[in-house]
Regions:
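Peptidoglycan-targeting cell-wall enzymes and recognition modules
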Residues: 28-73, 78-83, 87-179
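Fungal secretory targeting signals
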Residues: 1-30
Length: 179
């Protein structure tokens, strides 16, 4: 059963990346994320991880995201960081699903010392130093203000800047593309 789910997901990702690549080949850098792409991505995520269909019983409901909610942000990150191959898309998606406990977490609660690891989070559970680099990148792109970053004087404050949906679901693609 798991093999069939994985095969279906990879075929769906392949369809998604084919459409994405065709749009990229027309020299359009910014591809409009459309309903069909969102539906495919939602189905891919739910096939890989059925638990993403709901946030019922999530340990931290305020952090939980369903596949349907996450899909447009994830697709936009593929566009923003020029990810277009099946391997890139599968790697980034699976990493986020694994690291965030199937989108149930957006911040670290489980470090080797037993408590949270300050500043660690986003959907790929980046360490605090990478969240600082990511926040600086977002400032350079005009997506965050320098004032907000300068005011973030602790690792958890920087994490708070990069945890909104439009940034948290882009952190893994940013990491792959830049680090």
């Amino acid at each position: 059963m798991a093999f069939r789910r994985t095969l279906f997901a990879l075929l769906s990702i392949s369809s998604l990346t084919t459409a994405h690549s065709l749009l990229h080949s027309s020299n359009k850098r910014d591809i409009a994320v459309n309903d069909a792409m969102i539906t495919i991505m939602t189905n891919v995520i739910q096939t890989i991880s059925p638990a993403t269909s709901t946030c019922d019983n999530a340990p931290h409901p305020e952090e939980c995201s369903t596949a349907q909610h996450a899909a447009p942000f994830i697709l936009q990150s593929f566009n923003d960081y020029d990810l277009a191959t099946v391997g890139e898309i599968a790697a980034v998606t699976s990493l986020m699903l694994f690291e965030s406990g199937e989108f149930k977490y957006n911040k670290n609660y489980f470090s080797p010392s037993g408590g949270p690891n300050p500043g660690q989070g986003t959907r790929n559970m980046q360490q605090a130093n990478f969240n600082s680099l990511y926040a600086a990148y977002l400032v350079s792109q005009g997506k965050l203000s320098q004032e907000a970053l300068s005011a973030a004087t602790s690792p958890d404050a920087v994490l708070a800047l990069v945890r909104p949906d439009e940034f948290t679901f882009g952190s893994a693609a940013w990491f792959l593309a830049t680090q």
